[in-house]
Curated annotation (Swiss-Prot):
Keyword Hydrolase: no
Function: Ferredoxins are iron-sulfur proteins that transfer electrons in a wide variety of metabolic reactions.
Top-level taxon of origin: Bacteria
Organism: Rickettsia felis (strain ATCC VR-1525 / URRWXCal2) (Rickettsia azadi)
Keyword Iron-sulfur: yes
InterPro entries (alphabetical): 4Fe4S_Fe-S-bd (IPR017896), 4Fe4S_Fe_S_CS (IPR017900), 7Fe_ferredoxin (IPR000813), Fd_C (IPR022569), FdxA (IPR054829), RnfB_subfamily (IPR050294)
Domain 4Fe-4S ferredoxin-type: 2-30, 31-60
Designated name of the protein: Ferredoxin
Positions with a binding annotation for [3Fe-4S] cluster: 9, 17, 50
Keywords: 3Fe-4S, 4Fe-4S, Electron transport, Iron, Iron-sulfur, Metal-binding, Repeat, Transport
Length: 109
């Protein structure tokens, strides 16, 4: 089992979660973070640190996010992030928007 970063992170990319992860399993793309499911130890320590509630435990309805994370890391070259950095400049503007992945990322692939 792993934790996943979902649609809420898109266009926000708050990185509070990165600082608390004991195994450095977060990876970043231009508009969001993902958790490497092969590195996550399922501790959940990152969950309360996400200010927009974008981190959830793996479940059948979130399996697509596990697959996306693997694809972004293995095929798109997303790099490991181990230190907190500022959120995206318009994060507050996008934090309440829904279905951001299909609108901003899926169309780029």
């Amino acid at each position: 089992m792993t934790y996943v970063v979902n649609d809420e992170c898109v266009k926000c990319k708050y990185t509070d979660c990165v600082d608390v992860c004991p195994v450095d399993c977060f990876y970043e793309g231009e508009f969001m973070l993902v958790i490497n499911p092969d590195e996550c130890i399922d501790c959940g320590v990152c969950v309360p640190d996400c200010p927009i509630d974008a981190i959830k435990p793996e479940s059948p309805e979130l399996i697509e996010w596990v697959e996306r994370a693997k694809d972004f890391i293995e095929n798109k070259g997303w790099k490991n992030i181990t230190k907190k950095k500022p959120a995206l400049p318009d994060a507050d503007k996008f934090k309440d928007e829904k279905n951001k992945f299909n609108k901003y990322i899926n169309n780029m692939n």
